[in-house]
């Protein structure tokens, strides 16, 4: 038992699991219908990245070659040094993105379903309703004492709530995924291995490392209708996707391996960003201006300079 003082001093940052420290990952992907569409949209997506011709060290040929099949359109494939690729579709902060993708330069980009890169930590998924692990039973009263008989297992759906992006890419992808399960025109149903995927829901600790992983083998069965209104006070459009699963497994992530991976991937990534000359870590010229190690004078002068620029622009805009 903790006393109140011990709780405040020692366990304030590691007390209980917070409901917003989670992330969702496509561990495996369905492999139908997307291959026929990838070739037609990969060049278009590359031209609309909004960056120069060399994006994160990838050329147009590399992007076309690195496209894989995911839900009718695919995502851009992230290959870590370990060779494991995952598809991040939602995370709370950059710490969770860093713990999953293992690179500061790439991990800050949320990979969308249609090869479009977003320079953010990713907030497309804002809620996950985990299903219950529940057995069906009935009570037999034919004996002196009631006897409980297990009749089977009840599988509740997995419900993931999305924020619709500015071009509704995730909404269209989920709609087509449901149509891939059963064609709305012909009524033909796809094979399970062609439309099933594994969604992994990770629980993260306060330092960003995942400690629990829940894996679902499932496919989407419904996409809710977003509510559109002129009286909505400019709210963000949201929709829910319901997944039916066959298998749900929960397991712990080995902490020692997570720490070893963090040391090899994250810390080395930080050193590569900050620069390491002759074994001594030092800031580069561009990053040294952002450091607080040089005192507060430089930061205050930079803030004052920026404030003056903003004030000048505000006066001009006000005059117009």
Swiss-Prot record:
The keyword Transmembrane helix does not apply. Keywords: Late protein, Viral baseplate protein, Viral release from host cell, Viral tail assembly, Viral tail protein, Virion. GO terms for biological process: viral tail assembly. It comes from the Viruses. It is found in: Virion. Its main location: virion. One of its GO terms (cellular component) is virus tail, baseplate. The keyword Secreted does not apply. Induction: Expressed in the late phase of the viral replicative cycle. Baseplate protein that forms, together with gp48, the baseplate-tail tube junction. The tail tube first 2 annuli are formed by gp48 and gp54, which are in continuation of the spike complex. Involved in the tail assembly. Morphogenesis of the baseplate is completed by association of gp48 and gp54, which bind the upper part of the baseplate dome to form the platform for polymerization of the tail tube. Homohexamer. The tube second annulus is composed of a gp54 hexameric ring. Interacts with the tail tube protein gp19. Interacts with the first layer of sheath proteins gp18. Part of the baseplate macromolecular complex which consists of gp5, gp5.4, gp27 (central spike complex); gp6, gp25, gp53 (inner baseplate); gp7, gp8 (intermediate baseplate); gp9, gp10, gp11, gp12 (peripheral); gp48 and gp54 (proximal region of the tail tube). This is Baseplate tail-tube junction protein gp54. The gene is 54.
């Amino acid at each position: 038992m903790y006393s109140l003082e011990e709780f405040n001093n020692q366990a304030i940052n590691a007390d209980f699991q917070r409901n917003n420290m989670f992330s969702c990952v496509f561990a495996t992907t369905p492999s139908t219908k997307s291959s026929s569409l990838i070739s037609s949209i990969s060049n278009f997506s590359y031209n609309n990245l909004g960056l120069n011709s060399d994006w994160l060290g990838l050329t147009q040929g590399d992007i076309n070659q690195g496209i894989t099949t995911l839900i009718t359109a695919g995502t851009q494939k992230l290959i870590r040094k370990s060779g494991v690729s995952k598809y991040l579709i939602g995370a709370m902060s950059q710490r969770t993105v860093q713990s999953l993708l293992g690179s500061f330069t790439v991990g800050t980009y949320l990979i969308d379903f249609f090869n479009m890169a977003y320079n953010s930590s990713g907030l497309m998924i804002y809620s996950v309703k985990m299903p219950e692990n529940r057995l069906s039973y009935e009570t037999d009263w034919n004996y002196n004492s009631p006897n409980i008989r297990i009749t089977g297992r009840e599988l509740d759906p997995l419900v993931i709530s999305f924020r619709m992006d500015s071009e509704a890419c995730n909404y269209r992808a989920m709609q087509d995924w449901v149509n891939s399960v059963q064609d709305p025109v012909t009524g033909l149903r796809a094979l399970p291995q062609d439309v099933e995927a594994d969604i992994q829901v990770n629980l993260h600790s306060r330092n960003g490392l995942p400690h629990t992983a829940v894996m679902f083998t499932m496919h989407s069965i419904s996409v809710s209708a977003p509510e559109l209104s002129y009286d909505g006070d400019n709210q963000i459009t949201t929709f829910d996707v319901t997944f039916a699963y066959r298998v749900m497994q929960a397991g712990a992530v080995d902490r020692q391996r997570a720490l070893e991976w963090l040391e090899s991937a994250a810390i080395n990534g930080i050193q590569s960003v900050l620069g390491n000359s002759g074994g001594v870590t030092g800031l580069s010229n561009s990053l040294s201006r952002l450091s607080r190690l040089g005192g507060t004078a430089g930061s205050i002068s930079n803030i004052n300079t920026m404030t003056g620029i903003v004030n000048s622009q505000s006066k001009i805009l006000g005059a117009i």
